[in-house]
Amino acid sequence: MEQELIVRDLTPQDDIRTVARLIYETDEYIYPYMFSSRPEEAECVLGQMIAADTVYHWSHIKTAVVGGRIAGIVVWHKYPVKASRRAMLEAYARADAVADERFERVYNDYFGLLEGEPEGVYIANVCVDKAFRGRGIAKALLGGFLRDGETYHLEAVQQNAAAVRLYEALGFRVTGEYEGFGGVPCYRMTRPSRDEKLSACSGISQ
């Protein structure tokens, strides 16, 4: 029997370690560099960040739950985004880890730049556990999260064609290209609110 998929907010009582692992697995460039390809350390630090006032705070994470297990996550923020460098450094300390020059580079080249983004909602991370992939969970998770009255922004690696197709199927459109962290070609994508779409069409004669 197919297990029911539930889309809901993350709570502090959930399996935070799994959520931290999924955040780490979201991006094969930023997080392996930031944590020197040490996933166990990353899970500890990111777990502390989820509990603190950082860009990963649990109140900004939507989950897909299948059979009681967290199968996927969306990390999001309402603009303006607060990167919270101090809180991130404190999370490193609580995890008995050292925030070295790699953290500083990622903060300056990625996290810090988020504070200058436009209005709307920024989707920072989308990830489905490898054990649950191929079941349409990412589409269901995003479909349960997105609302017509909001404008959403995200970035996608250009070579990740499957992700780009998914976002386009959900109403996102490419609005720009840029060189992402480590020189990786990326797209900026936006899903305008329903109100914006109606406004754009209001002057068209029927």
Task: Kindly give the residue locations of the regions a language model identified.
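Conserved acetyl-CoA-binding loop-helix of GNAT-fold acetyltransferases
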Residues: 134-147, 165-169
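Active-site rim helix/loop that mediates acceptor-substrate recognition in acyltransferases
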Residues: 39-61, 65-66
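Conserved GNAT acetyl-CoA-binding A-motif
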Residues: 119-121, 148-159
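C-terminal "cap" of GNAT-fold acetyltransferases
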Residues: 153-164, 170, 176-206
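Conserved acyl-donor/pantetheine-binding loop and adjacent beta-alpha core of acyl/acetyltransferases
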Residues: 80-121
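Conserved N-terminal entry element of GNAT/NAT acetyltransferase domains
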Residues: 1-14, 195-206
